Amino acid sequence: MANVIVIGAQWGDEGKGKITDLLSRSADMVVRSQGGVNAGHTIVVQGQTFKLHLIPSGILYPDTECIIGSGTVIDPKVLLQELAQLQGFGVSTENLFISQTAHVTMPYHRLLDKASEERRGKRKIGTTGRGIGPTYADKSERIGIRVVDLMNPDDLREKLEWTINYKNVILDKLYNLEPLDPQSVISEYLEYAEQLRPYVVDSSLKIYDAIKKRKNILFEGAQGTLLDLDHGTYPYVTSSNPIAGGACVGSGIGPTVIDRVIGVAKAYTTRVGEGPFPTELHGEIGELLGDRGAEFGTTTGRARRCGWFDGVIGRYAVRINGLDCLAITKLDVLDELKEIKVCVAYELDGKICHDFPSNASEFARCQPIYETLPGWQTSTSDCRTLDDLPKPALNYLKFLAELMEAPIAIVSLGASRDQTIIVEDPIHGPKRALLHANGEPVSITND
């Protein structure tokens, strides 16, 4: 039995979908604990591409139960579209379960999200416009609509009539937008409720029952560490907690049941939206990374900003999440480069900085300090063991492991399941001790 959290160690889009899909083969249950339709993951199986936003990656395994946990925010229309997409490809959805305490994204959330972002002007955050922030804001303000409310028509009518009238004042007076018709919204969401009713459960209880039965449970994170509301590049963050601790809160389980935490990071760095990005590349190499890596957001379609690997934020992710091991993805994207740079520290106001600064204005002033490594200029997409890799590629991985102070358990070399090197068992491998504590440098594995 193992309970494992998979999180993003950068700004999201690290390839968590593929890694979770791979690990789901050994999982009895996959749990999505936070975020909403602002996060997307792409899975390629036998040439078929699945792009999902809410449904966990494990849904493609017929015997794996999938939970959309209480920390998520659910757009019923999008969720039903995903269900229809999967069913259209012959994928069973009978093992999907939705937390009754998850919050629901409403039409006014989307309107307010877009209007607020537009009103910010130069101070915009770069949101997806899907209503995620306003949904979480209502949750904190304690006026949110939860899935359990959808299941009770009388409660839903009472709550929505009051809430929509309240939101209409803001839409009209602050943003000069047309007010919503409460009865139209109520009718729409009552229809969604009936379609989703068979999937709704007490998710915390269901997860706990699986823990007591010593099942293998995979907790699938959305977005990435540097987008965390408390520990990310605030204010250019999401509205939830994508770090490992957030998986426990958003699933309704205690931290003592977690056995391992796996961090997923690209072999380079990308970011979507606004905010500081010290290693960002604006020229030919940045374009090459974007083209070879197909760096366009699953949710928004926006081009991702690309840059060199940032070891400073990598070490920060290891610390904040207590990572036991790493999965490095898209190594093959670097195949054509003659040399590769890695950020090992920052220069901040004339001083060397080895740690991530929590102040956004300081982070924006950070200049990367690079070490340059030789490239390999040969294809790695068909490599299936470390021995298959060109020596410079292997040395690059060793450098990243030592820089981040965490062993590498998985190396991904393409979108397909088989384009993967399993270095060590990522689920049942050893717990990570404090690396370097005994004076010994970390290598690719803990051996």
Curated annotation (Swiss-Prot):
Q: Which Pfam families match?
A: Adenylsucc_synt
Per UniProt, the keywords (alphabetical) are:
Cytoplasm, GTP-binding, Ligase, Magnesium, Metal-binding, Nucleotide-binding, Purine biosynthesis
Cofactor names from the entry are:
Mg(2+)
Q: Which residues bind Mg(2+)?
A: 13, 40
Q: Which reaction does it catalyse?
A: IMP + L-aspartate + GTP = N(6)-(1,2-dicarboxyethyl)-AMP + GDP + phosphate + 2 H(+)
Question: Which residues lie in coiled coils?
Answer: none
Q: Where in the cell is it found?
A: Cytoplasm
EC number assigned by the record:
6.3.4.4
Q: In which pathway does it act?
A: Purine metabolism; AMP biosynthesis via de novo pathway; AMP from IMP: step 1/2
Q: Which residues are recorded as binding substrate?
A: 298-304
The EC class name is: ligase
Q: Which SUPFAM superfamilies match?
A: P-loop containing nucleoside triphosphate hydrolases (SSF52540)
Residues recorded as binding IMP, renumbered to this chain, are 13-16, 38-41, 128, 142, 223, 238, 302
- Example GO biological process term? IMP metabolic process
Locate the active site.
Answer: 13 (proton acceptor), 41 (proton donor)
Q: Which GO terms describe its cellular component?
A: cytoplasm
Residues that coordinate or bind GTP: 12-18, 40-42, 304, 330-332, 412-414
- A GO MF label: GTP binding
Query: Which PROSITE patterns does the UniProt entry name for this protein?
Result: ADENYLOSUCCIN_SYN_1 (PS01266), ADENYLOSUCCIN_SYN_2 (PS00513)
Highest taxon in the source lineage:
Bacteria
- Could you tell me what this protein does? Plays an important role in the de novo pathway of purine nucleotide biosynthesis. Catalyzes the first committed step in the biosynthesis of AMP from IMP.
- Subunit comment: Homodimer.
Name the family: Belongs to the adenylosuccinate synthetase family.
User: This chain belongs to which protein, by name?
Assistant: Adenylosuccinate synthetase
Q: Which organism is it from?
A: Rippkaea orientalis (strain PCC 8801 / RF-1) (Cyanothece sp. (strain PCC 8801))
